[in-house]
Amino acid sequence: MPIQILPARLANQIAAGEVVERPASVVKELVENSIDAGATRIDIDIEKGGSKLIRIRDNGSGIPKDELTLALSRHATSKITSLDDLEAIVSLGFRGEALASISSVSRLTLTSRTVAQEEAWSAYAEGREMNVKLKPAAHPIGTTIDVVDLFFNTPARRKFLRADKTEFTHIDELLKRIALSRLDVTINLRHNGKMVRQYRAAQTKPQIEKRLAAVCGANFLQHALEVELEHGELKFHGWISSPEGARAQGDIQYCYVNGRMMKDKLINHAIRQGYESSLPANQYAAYILFIEINPHDVDVNVHPAKHEVRFHQARLVHDFIYQAIFGALQQGASLPDVVGHIQSEAEEQQLESKESYFPPMKEYVRQPQQTHYPKSEQLRAAVESTPSYPNKAPLDSWIPKGNVGSSSSNSTAPSRSFHTDKPTKKALSNYNELLTTQNREQRESTSQVNEQSHTFRSTQQIERVAPQVTQVSKNGITLGKVLSVVESTFALLQQGKQLQLLNLRYAEFVKIYGQLSSVNVEPLKPQPLLIPLSVGIDESICNNLSNYASLLKSLGIDLKVKNRTNIIVMAVCQPIRQQNLQQLIPNLLRYLEQINPSLEQVIKWLSHQIQHDEVSYTTAQAIQLVMELEQLWGDELNNFYPKLLKDIDITQVIQAFSHE
């Protein structure tokens, strides 16, 4: 068979395989065209599930007479003229394939009139070459498209259509999605001459709620939590169901990117992660969510049906969505009564002996059973591992190396270790930058201060030298060489001929305490959160927030009042940046309200609160932790013995070998 150019109708029929899957696909393309034309009212008439008739009528801007012929041609559109336009696309359609593809598999008539025209014109294509014929018609300003006998000339496609009721159900669901995306557009749907849906345009809040209830049901509205988050040009808003409003199936899950319906895997995964600790595996969240992003930062030309997009900063978008969902659920949940627990902790700290550095380890690291907040191992791992802001989404399975959709079972799988096998040069460099609280001149002057023994670190200035990649402490004293890790929580050290065992979990605590105690030298540097965090607090605490402004500022914590029961966390210091700020900040404010503590008491209280997962340390992690301790404390680490470090006596083992 020789190579030849396909006839126009055959080429369009082949292309229609991607664009026109079923009657609902036709409705989608035509209704989106009406919205792009600025229509505020769209009427849809369906007969026999769309196989007999699909009629879309709108009051949009219409199509001029001299453009009607082009409208039915392939790759003809008024929405883009260059690649730059595609990269900044804001319209729902842009390929110019819909009308040509639909007309090739049906009997299509396009009737339209613009404001500038005195009469309307109808266009239809016929014949092998799809020649377009025009004739005058009576029609108001706007456009009407009649699609008759869908797939009449492609029997193979027609036989795959389902029953009329099934096909109409798909159309009904599609229009629900569109009705939610454009609340300002009136949409009427008829089937076989009977009015089935009437979605009136909504402007006020009661009207919007009424439309939401009409689409999703009153039960969704009853359990809906409004969510809104903004960061630069990235905006996120909508409604999500509380855990009490969860459903047995995922039938109310609507997501939009710049007004475009989406079924994107990355977005779905972020939403699932946000609900992971709130819903059991057999329940589904209900949500209506809108993402607004700079068109230059998203590629919509990925999927033929435009159901998927590609974000230029996928990780940022994923975590942004996760943060918004998780934060809204935390605010919507009723907070447990923790006042009594905090009061008892405060009394214990006030009675603590001044000569004692620390109470037993179990009093400093809170055990899981002491808190009443719901937890998730993956969420805690996520909080620990994020370098950007609290509540960052888990990293273990979202990146689409293969099929991201497979991550739906992620909540039942064991959590992957979130530590790297070894500290990278970049990690060490970042750590160096984060912990440096003095400039070079200050460090040079500080290094000249005579060394002296300190009886209590928090009451005297402590020399701070930025950590270096080499394992040398600020006083030239090291803990020794890390040989191995024992039982995942202890490091075996060699100091000369002496072997020692280091408690790695207690070492983490000592590191955090040292970082917080540097506030006695100068205020901790606030680090702005990538996305400001909204936190719910008691109204009385919010009213007295100004009383703690100076203390919070010295700790590098920047809070702003949002309303009477909510504050915005703008920045926190590095030591607490990786904690669950949704819980830590309200607890801190309650503690300040209870006893009006001193700065030193707050430092010790914060050291109590900071939690760590039951981590299985690797040798590389142990080496890095030892290095950090040496830079923070130097020879002052002696003050934390023997809870931190114990000598190992191998004399008996040597003697046992000698007697064999």
From Swiss-Prot:
It comes from the Bacteria. It comes from Aliivibrio fischeri (strain ATCC 700601 / ES114). PANTHER family: DNA MISMATCH REPAIR PROTEIN MLH, PMS, MUTL (PTHR10073), DNA MISMATCH REPAIR PROTEIN MLH1 (PTHR10073:SF12). This is DNA mismatch repair protein MutL. Residues 406-417 have a biased composition (Low complexity). One of its GO terms (molecular function) is mismatched DNA binding. One of its GO terms (biological process) is mismatch repair. Belongs to the DNA mismatch repair MutL/HexB family. It holds the Pfam family MutL_C.
